[in-house]
């Protein structure tokens, strides 16, 4: 919905259906993953997110196979801890990131124990992510602060939507993931 304005899950659509939608009110269609990789062709580093909906294991394996022949630099991230663990076990040379948020405060529809485990990053001892990308709104959550101190991962904020949020996030986070604006250049 964010990029194309239709209210349907990507996993519910065929590519034949998706290619009729346009991205962000432009004339650009939704590209296949291989098309994106061909256009980028290693010119810039990539953050590749493995979505947690659907068959995370199959998606993770397919993404890894595609990226095996990619000539550029990339890291992977996912909200699904076992996708991160899969990369730890099968592609340990790839930088891995655990995406997370406070599932309770964000009112995400999950079972209470899933919210508890994911909000508190309780599987990080298994997945050992290189970085934690955490919702910047909840940067003071105890479990996030504790994980940063115990495991010393890179500290990443998502998703910053304006200059004011950026300036505030820079006080806490090492790396910023931003969307929907272009940050002002630093002097």
Where are these regions (language model features)?
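Metal-dependent phosphodiesterase/phospholipase catalytic core, i.e.
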Residues: 1-104, 125-129, 133-137
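C-terminal active-site rim and adjoining tail of enzyme catalytic domains
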Residues: 28, 107-187
């Amino acid at each position: 919905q964010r990029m194309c304005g239709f209210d349907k899950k990507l996993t519910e659509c065929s590519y034949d259906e998706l290619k009729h939608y346009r991205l962000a009110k432009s004339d650009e269609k939704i590209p296949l993953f291989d098309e994106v990789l061909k256009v980028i062709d290693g010119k810039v580093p990539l953050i590749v997110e493995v979505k947690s909906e659907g068959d995370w294991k199959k998606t993770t394996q397919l993404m890894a196979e595609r990226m095996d022949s990619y000539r550029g630099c990339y890291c992977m991230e996912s909200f699904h801890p076992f996708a991160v663990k899969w990369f730890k076990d099968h592609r340990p040379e790839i930088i891995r990131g655990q995406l997370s948020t406070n599932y309770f405060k964000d009112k995400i529809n999950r079972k209470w124990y899933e919210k508890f485990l994911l909000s508190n990053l309780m599987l990080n001892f298994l997945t050992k992510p290189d970085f934690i990308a955490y919702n910047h709104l909840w940067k003071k959550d105890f479990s996030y602060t504790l994980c940063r101190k115990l495991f010393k991962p890179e500290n990443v904020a998502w998703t910053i939507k304006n200059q004011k949020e950026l300036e505030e996030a820079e006080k806490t986070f090492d790396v910023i993931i931003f969307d929907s604006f272009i940050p002002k250049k630093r002097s």
